[in-house]
């Protein structure tokens, strides 16, 4: 992986610096998302890896730190898609769709995360997660989760009575070889 910084000397790969080489991601990173976990305008980078532990990078005084273990999100799975937004906590939560394993829904509690996917019925452990996005499907002022599965059932999860309910239409739900999901609003 590369982390490019546009410094006064031009573009620099921060992972090429000796101080950062020990935290270089050597597994297959499939998806990334920027996360302001503390709500202070400083972003970290969540890297969903395939066959290796999840990474969560933050830059501190010129050094890249991998905080995934400290944040208890360093799980090994078939990471395929990841999104972040105000899903449940009022802060930036993270949803990760995975292949050959359970999905993760990380609830943000003061900058630390707790996986609550099973509690909210969106772990979808027998599907192979692919494209995922957040959207206010029902136009009610909150983010819902739209996720697709490779040759599996696609989901449109909306929060109802403290659980997510899959409201995918039969047409959308049909298993296909899907990779990406996008949302477009028309008013």
Briefly describe each language-model feature range.
Residues 1-15, 53-67, 102-116, 153-167:
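Beta-propeller blade repeat segments, especially FG-GAP/WD-type strand-to-loop junctions
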Residues 8-9, 16-19, 37, 61, ...:
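Disulfide-stabilized cysteine-rich extracellular repeat microdomains
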Residues 39-48, 89-97, 140-148:
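Acidic/hydrophobic-patterned starts of short beta strands in beta-sheet-rich repeat architectures
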Residues 185-187:
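Conserved small/polar residues in nucleotide/adenosyl-binding loops
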Residues 83, 88-91, 117, 129-134, ...:
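Extended non-membrane alpha-helical scaffolds
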Residues 20-32, 72-83, 122-133, 170-182:
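Repeat-based blade/solenoid architectures
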Residues 78-85, 94-104, 132-133:
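Internal metal/ion-chelating core segments
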């Amino acid at each position: 992986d590369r982390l490019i910084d546009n410094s006064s000397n031009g573009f620099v790969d921060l992972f090429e610096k000796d101080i950062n080489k020990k935290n270089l991601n050597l597994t297959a990173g499939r998806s990334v998302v920027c996360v302001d976990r503390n709500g202070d305008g400083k972003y970290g980078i969540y890297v969903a890896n395939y066959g290796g532990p999840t990474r969560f990078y933050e830059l501190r005084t010129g050094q890249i730190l991998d905080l995934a273990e400290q944040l208890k999100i360093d799980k090994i799975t078939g990471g395929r898609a990841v999104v972040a937004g105000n899903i449940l906590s009022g802060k930036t939560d993270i949803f990760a769709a995975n292949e050959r394993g359970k999905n993760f829904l990380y609830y943000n509690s003061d900058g630390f995360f707790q996986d609550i996917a099973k509690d909210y019925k969106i772990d979808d452990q027998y599907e192979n997660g692919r494209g995922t996005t957040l959207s206010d499907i029902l136009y009610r002022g909150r983010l819902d989760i739209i996720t697709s599965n490779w040759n599996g059932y696609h989901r449109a999860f909306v929060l109802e009575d403290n659980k997510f309910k899959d409201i995918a239409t039969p047409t959308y739900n049909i298993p296909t070889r899907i990779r990406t999901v996008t949302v477009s609003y028309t008013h």
